[in-house]
Structure formats: C-alpha cells, structure tokens
Regions:
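Class I S-adenosyl-L-methionine-dependent methyltransferase catalytic core
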Residues: 1-186
Length: 186
C-alpha cells in the first residue's frame, strides 16, 4: 500500500465514484488525469457497459478500474512490475470487482498468444518506451479487436500519434497539459 498521503488515483464515475486508491511510486508510472479520464469515458459511455476491456499498461489502474466501476463486463489488466500487480490486486479486491483479471506480463509478449477479441482497449504505455505503433500493429494483426472496437491512445503532447492500422479511424482526440489522447475506432 502507498504511504499515507502518497500516490492515489480517484475513481471518477460509476459504482465506485469518489473512491481513492493507492498506487506505487515507480519511475514512469503516470496515471491518466481526472480530466482526461472524464473526457474518455464520456466518449465511451454508450459502449462501456457490458464491454470486454483490455488495459495493456495498467500502472495505477486508473483506466481499467474506472471501466469496471462504470459497468464493463470483463476487464483484463496487464503490467510487468510485481509491485504494481500486487497493488492492482489489492485495489480490485478492496472494491470487490470480480470481473477484473490482473496479469503480470510484458504487454508485447502477451499479445503474441492466441487472441480473444476485446471491445475496448486502453493503450497508454510509458511515454519513454515509444511503444504505441508496435502495440497498435499487434492488436490489429493478431486479432485482438472486436469488429467495431474502440482503442484509446495516450502519448506525450510533443509527439504526434503514430500511423494507425489502415482500417482504424481516429474518432476523437484532444490535448490536456503534456498529454495527447485519442480514441480510434476499428
């Protein structure tokens, strides 16, 4: 658990609205801010209930736990840091979110396995890792997306989004502070 007054993320909507959850203080761990999440989940509001969601770089859990709080049927959250995974499991259990599965794995390697299509995928890797393009290609090429899937992308505001697979359309995009974020649709 984070120290008192330490790093916390707040669930901003749904069943667990207002709950504050700790997350570890690790380099590169940067939760999507409240304003960004509010905008994102307003965009996703018509589709998030009963959706199958994949959070590839779960980190603080802000996106995956928010999706579960707002009625997603299933949420699979990945992170490769053991400390992060332990905290995500504790937060999931604290909220009683039985539809959330947490996996300790490298996202790129995990995407090599046999796919199960998801309705909504959150792609918010550490900015310094520069993984957006490779992850988007794997999601498309390996069959991880439902036919009408939504893909959330987050990047440093100083960079443009990479070229997306040809059958994706950048549906919405905005900037908030040092973050560029967008929603693509397959």
């Amino acid at each position: 658990m984070a120290k008192r007054g330490g790093n916390q993320v707040r669930i901003i909507g749904g069943e667990h609205r207002g709950r504050k959850l700790p997350f570890p203080d690790l380099p590169g761990l940067r939760p999507s801010g409240d304003r960004v999440r509010e905008t994102l989940f307003n965009w996703l509001q018509p589709v998030i209930i009963n959706a199958r969601c994949l959070d590839l770089f779960a980190g603080s859990g802000a996106l995956g736990l928010e999706a579960a709080s707002r009625g997603a049927r299933e949420v699979v959250m990945l992170d490769q840091a053991a400390q992060v995974v332990r905290q995500l499991e504790a937060n999931r259990d604290l909220l009683g979110l039985t539809q959330v599965q947490i996996i300790k794995a490298d996202a790129l390697r995990w995407l090599e396995q046999y796919p199960r299509p998801f309705d909504v995928v959150f792609v918010d890797p550490p900015f310094a890792a520069n993984l957006l393009s490779e992850v988007c290609a794997k999601l498309e090429d390996r069959g991880w997306l439902a036919s009408d899937a939504f893909i959330y992308l987050e990047e440093d505001a100083d960079r443009d989004f990479p070229d997306l697979p040809e059958n994706w359309r950048l549906y919405r995009q905005q900037q908030a502070g040092q973050v560029r974020f967008g929603l693509a649709r397959r």
